[in-house]
């Protein structure tokens, strides 16, 4: 009898399910000072059709090159904190909706069409100040689009940008095909 109970308890301990705890990390950032935004042409930007030969130059993702498509972001309905006309820092952050940038670059938004053009993505430049045009992302991928603006000028303000296609690896050829990239824009001020 002793042997049967021992054997049954051993069988049950081996076949019973094991439950292990798992952690879930949830992160959020809540701000009082957000704004609504509008993007020209409802955020649809058509870069047109270009030939693969148009990518032969040595234009980097860091350098602004005229000829891209311009678009405007309008900032409105900002919940202004405090009173008076004070200097604010307006942040307009661009990030890939998929979370994936072009391989080897933190400044080039990837082509999301896997069957599409290869070795080409999209870059976005701030052209608000023609004397100071810059890629909205630094070489490390952090946002550079921070603008000083007075409280009185914040609501209904417009900000100019330009976007174009960008060769990713200068040593490789661009291949033909469609290009699509979804970019999320976050706007806040401090």
Task: Label the predicted regions.
Residues 19-190:
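Mature extracellular/passenger domains of Gram-negative fimbrial/pilin and adhesin proteins
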């Amino acid at each position: 009898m002793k042997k049967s109970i021992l054997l049954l308890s051993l069988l049950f301990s081996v076949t019973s399910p094991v439950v292990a705890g798992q952690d879930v990390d949830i992160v959020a950032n809540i701000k009082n000072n957000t704004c609504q935004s509008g993007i020209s042409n409802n955020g649809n930007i058509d870069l047109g059709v270009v030939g693969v030969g148009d990518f032969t130059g040595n234009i980097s993702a860091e350098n602004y090159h005229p000829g891209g498509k311009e678009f405007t972001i309008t900032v409105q309905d900002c919940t202004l904190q405090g009173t008076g006309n004070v200097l604010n820092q307006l942040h307009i952050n661009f990030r890939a909706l998929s979370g994936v940038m072009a391989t080897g670059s933190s400044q080039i938004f990837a082509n999301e069409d896997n069957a599409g053009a290869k070795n080409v993505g999209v870059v976005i430049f701030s052209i608000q100040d023609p004397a100071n045009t810059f890629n909205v992302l630094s070489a490390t991928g952090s946002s550079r689009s921070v603008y000083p603006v007075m409280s009185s000028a914040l609501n209904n303000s417009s900000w100019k940008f330009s976007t174009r296609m960008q060769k990713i690896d200068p040593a490789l050829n661009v291949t033909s095909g469609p290009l699509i990239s979804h970019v999320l824009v976050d706007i806040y001020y401090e």
